[in-house]
Amino acid sequence: MQTAAVTEAPYQVFWAPGCTSCLRTKEYLKRQGIPFESVNVRTDPQGMAKLQAIGASSVPIVARGDRFIYAQSLEDLKAFLGLDGEAEQKLAPAELIRRADIVLAAAARYMRQMSAEQLDGPFRNSWAPPRGIGHHVFRIAEAYLEAVETPCELTYEMTMRGTYEVKPGDDVVGYGDGIRARLAAWWQENSGRDFSVMVPTYYGEQTLHEVLERTTWHSAQHTRQLIVMVESFGITPDQPLTQADLAGLPLPEKAWDTD
């Protein structure tokens, strides 16, 4: 009597348009040649219900059967997928802070180039208008500061706080200038701290170094989206981010997810 072979369930990737880690996760699985079922929680009527049914609450999620992982950390994702390989080298904390400053300054420049109508209108499949995306760039850095200064767990809600409430005319650039100054001041006081310590986040325990790296590249990816927006309006970006500005950051290949 023959026994039927047991086939493992395929991987599923739960994602949403405009989500930076979602795009990076899908690109990573494709590079590794790993097939997956794509579940866009914004367009699939059952997408969010499926995500919540396995016990998750936000994207990106990589799942297989009843197991899942929040995919913000590539190292955690590799472990979940059973992939070997050396851990990717991170930029030093001082360099990450320098890059974050470049990114925050750039985001403010691009927002200044857009009109009020452009800032507050819908854009492609974006989850927020340009003014909201700009706010999120700065809020990501502010959430990092709040988590390390309190200290407390870095939650998903912290990274999104205030972004959906942004209204036409809100001075997001002024808000961003304040966050940029706060980050610089924090570094002046904390450049000597131990960045190998573990800190709690909504995607699991991570080193402070990992959280700072994610803060930097997460803001950078959304700033790349602002460049796409500016260019789409027929405007030449004021000092576009260069390859040197972004080198060494674990960014997605694409600036905009067109899936």
Model-based region annotation:
Residues 2-35:
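Local sequence-structure signature of Cys/Sec-based thiol-disulfide redox active-site neighborhoods
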Residues 39-57, 81:
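Thioredoxin-like thiol-disulfide oxidoreductase module
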Residues 52-63, 72:
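Structural micro-motif
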Residues 64-89:
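Non-catalytic, surface beta->alpha helical segment in thiol-disulfide oxidoreductase systems
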Residues 83-96, 164:
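Short, charged, low-complexity loops and linkers
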Residues 92-114, 135-146, 178, 188:
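Alpha-helical bundle segments that constitute or directly flank the non-heme di-iron/ferroxidase center
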Residues 100-110, 164-199, 206-225:
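Acidic/histidine-rich alpha-helical segments that form the ligand environment
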Residues 118-162, 200-258:
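Short, contiguous alpha-helical
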